[in-house]
Amino acid sequence: MSIVTVQLGQCGNQIGFEVFDALFRDSHCSQGLCSKRDNEAYQASCRERFFREEENGVPVARAVLVDMEPKVINQTLSKAAQSGRWNYGQHTSFCQKQGSGNNWAYGYSVHGPKHEESIMNLIQTEVEKCDSLSGFFIIMSMAGGTGSGLGAFVTQKLQDQYSSSLKMNQIIWPYGTGEVIVQNYNSILTLSHLYRSSDALLIHENDAVHKICAKRMNIKQISFRDLNQVLAHQLGSVFQPTYSEDSSFHYRRNPLGDLMEHLVPHPEFKMLGVRNIPQMSAASLAYSAFTWAGLLKHLRQMLISSAKMEEGINWQVRPPLTGLPPIGKASAHKEHHFNTSLANLVVLRGREVHSADVEGFKDPALYTSWLEPVDAFSVWKTQRAFDKYEKSAALVSNSQLLVKPLDMIVGKAWNMFSSKAFIHQYTKFGMEEEDFLDSFALLEQVVASYGSLGP
């Protein structure tokens, strides 16, 4: 089944390019860890999901590109064409001459209704080229104007027109120090609207990705492309083909559906975080060796301690014993608290994958009391390695990972709202203060719901 990707705004289009490039490079790199037949099946499965064939034989991304300024879209189309490996389709992009000026209301209330027909027609055309549609993957920022405001509008229209198709939004959480003065307003408006219209929110924090670039990739001058390539690697490690539940010879057909079924058991809980190991520079990788036991030990501790990467994991945090608070709970540092999960998916790729022991992720102490571990944990596998790593593991977690950053962003936005700061920038484009209050109420309920999962 195929996935149609919608790239929105500067952030969405730049990340979208890196995602398709990473998917294509991985599926076409030489692999010595599986048979030629298995490798060809892997390539075919990737192609069905993310690409379609054009008459000239060059794979074309199943994507629609949207921005309110032409510069980034033109650059993105050009880079894909110049790669010589794959391309975007003709007539799959929409852009205008005027951006949204980091104003969520302008993207949502002005650009959205004005360009709805053109954008939705492009998406419909792409959908009609799929033999079978798994759903939509919408890549956007959370804090700007076009990606966030228009992105929320487009997601709502996708829900209206394709209510039976799955919608996953991949969202970039802004730097905590702030790129835009109104980013907290934009963020709460984006999240609250997506919570009503999307099936799942796959969230990446800029601060965390930046640390991976600096600490794990050893990059000195970190660019947006560096950040986007780390994001693309993490997304590829989740969405590239894996074996179906009942066979080690056939790849699963419906990755979005399978992922949602495992990870989003209740509409109150839609926030997913991704962790991936190992991630390191090519120079470091040349001198590194990995065991499944070591990788999974680190990944499990990253989960329960809310660590963003392998470096700096707090090994003091332990799951709670029955009837007792978790070790680490009494810490003065709130980030050291035990992270309770609703559901987890581990994706394993590489040599000897069937020998990997994931029993540590089935511990009932990791999960909220109202779900059995058999329902809360899933593992996907393939012996085909991903990218340049002989062994790699990814974790997609529906847990309390994002409660603290969400609570902080709601608090900052409320402080601004209570003093009526910058509200006029939104009300002049048709928004009312009641819209803000609705957003606050919804997100405060999300924080409370995740907080109720466990200790």
From Swiss-Prot:
Highly expressed in testis. SUPFAM superfamilies: Tubulin C-terminal domain-like, Tubulin nucleotide-binding domain-like. SMART domains: Tubulin. The keyword Iron-sulfur does not apply. This is Tubulin delta chain. The gene is Tubd1. GO terms for biological process: cell projection organization; microtubule-based process; positive regulation of smoothened signaling pathway. Coiled coil: none annotated. Acts as a positive regulator of hedgehog signaling and regulates ciliary function. GTP binds at A143, G144, G145, T146, G147, S148, G149. GO terms for molecular function: GTP binding; structural constituent of cytoskeleton. Found in a complex with TEDC1, TEDC2, TUBE1 and TUBD1. Transmembrane segments: none annotated. Keywords: Cell projection, Cilium biogenesis/degradation, Cytoplasm, Cytoskeleton, Developmental protein, GTP-binding, Microtubule, Nucleotide-binding, Nucleus. Its main location: other. Belongs to the tubulin family. It holds the Pfam family Tubulin. One of its GO terms (cellular component) is nucleoplasm. It comes from the Eukaryota. It is found in: Cell projection, Cilium; Cytoplasm, Cytoskeleton, Microtubule organizing center, Centrosome, Centriole; Cytoplasm; Nucleus.
